[in-house]
């Protein structure tokens, strides 16, 4: 495990560029956090009175208040159900006891349950009370996704596609770093990480939680997809900087672009950080330019649908800025040995999210 030289000067994450007009006040709806946690309790994922379990869930679910500042309670519940499911599944698949065979079984099983529900061949012959905690919660999630899309099934299908792409990227990302934990080519890392960061489904939540009136084909629009990829890259860079110390400490630096580039390019931290700052800023400029191209290319659509497109563009802005604010406070990323002044000295060990999950969850 590598360590950070604390005698070196601290750097600042304020060098990242975020347009001031993209920020939006945090969502004041918090009820979804406790209600979603209680659903997890009812399925057996969490224990009702376990403070560590609630701290874990809160550390996951509070991202909804940052990412979706305009959502009402019901919309927050949709987003929170998704976030709890993906974080639990991601953390569970990273457990040391998970063999390659178990990992493959899990991703295939939960893909099937999301598609077919109780008719999935994995659980169709099992009584509900005998299902595993994650089986039960997957059914809750599926129902919550279906309810608002009952008359627009293409929205449900689009979102399931985004979820599927994400959870099939978990294992390749872990494998890509190789046995030396720093052997992944940066191009391979960037390709897999763009999917694994999950922004396509984070933005795609709007396809089920919000009636935007955009046609289903919009989600395939190449300009829109390029905007989401640019945003993904910006978020990857920012999150990798915030989580740099924690990933070094946990021997996960092989998945961190700030670390990978130091190794591959044989450049000092400060030089790599400056280059990443410039790249992240260019991503913002690319998004701003593509916004204009997107609106111009869709000049033929109705005013109602255009309003939906504008809503989604603004939501992309809100997620980028919301991620900044959430990343700087979530115990999933921050670490007391951070080389950045904004998070240095903050101890996040009170939420041991890597170890609290029941090994019999699935």
Curated annotation (Swiss-Prot):
<comment type="function">
    <text>Terpene synthase that converts its substrate farnesyl diphosphate (FPP) into an unidentified sesquiterpene as a major product, as well as beta-maaliene, aristolene, calarene and 2 additional unidentified sesquiterpene as minor products. Is also able to convert geranyl diphosphate (GPP) into a mixture of monoterpenes including (Z)-beta-ocimene, (E)-beta-ocimene, allo-ocimene, linalool and beta-myrcene.</text>
</comment>
<feature type="short sequence motif" description="NDxxSxxxD/E motif">
    <location>
        <begin position="239"/>
        <end position="247"/>
    </location>
</feature>
<dbReference type="InterPro" id="IPR034686">
    <property type="entry name" value="Terpene_cyclase-like_2"/>
</dbReference>
<dbReference type="InterPro" id="IPR008949">
    <property type="entry name" value="Isoprenoid_synthase_dom_sf"/>
</dbReference>
<keyword id="KW-0479">Metal-binding</keyword>
<protein>
    <recommendedName>
        <fullName>Terpene synthase 3</fullName>
        <ecNumber>4.2.3.-</ecNumber>
        <ecNumber>4.2.3.106</ecNumber>
        <ecNumber>4.2.3.15</ecNumber>
    </recommendedName>
</protein>
<dbReference type="GO" id="GO:0051762">
    <property type="term" value="P:sesquiterpene biosynthetic process"/>
</dbReference>
<dbReference type="GO" id="GO:0031150">
    <property type="term" value="P:sorocarp stalk development"/>
</dbReference>
<dbReference type="GO" id="GO:0046872">
    <property type="term" value="F:metal ion binding"/>
</dbReference>
<feature type="short sequence motif" description="DDxx(x)D/E motif">
    <location>
        <begin position="90"/>
        <end position="95"/>
    </location>
</feature>
<dbReference type="GO" id="GO:0010333">
    <property type="term" value="F:terpene synthase activity"/>
</dbReference>
<dbReference type="GO" id="GO:0010334">
    <property type="term" value="F:sesquiterpene synthase activity"/>
</dbReference>
<comment type="similarity">
    <text>Belongs to the terpene synthase family.</text>
</comment>
<keyword id="KW-0456">Lyase</keyword>
<dbReference type="Pfam" id="PF19086">
    <property type="entry name" value="Terpene_syn_C_2"/>
</dbReference>
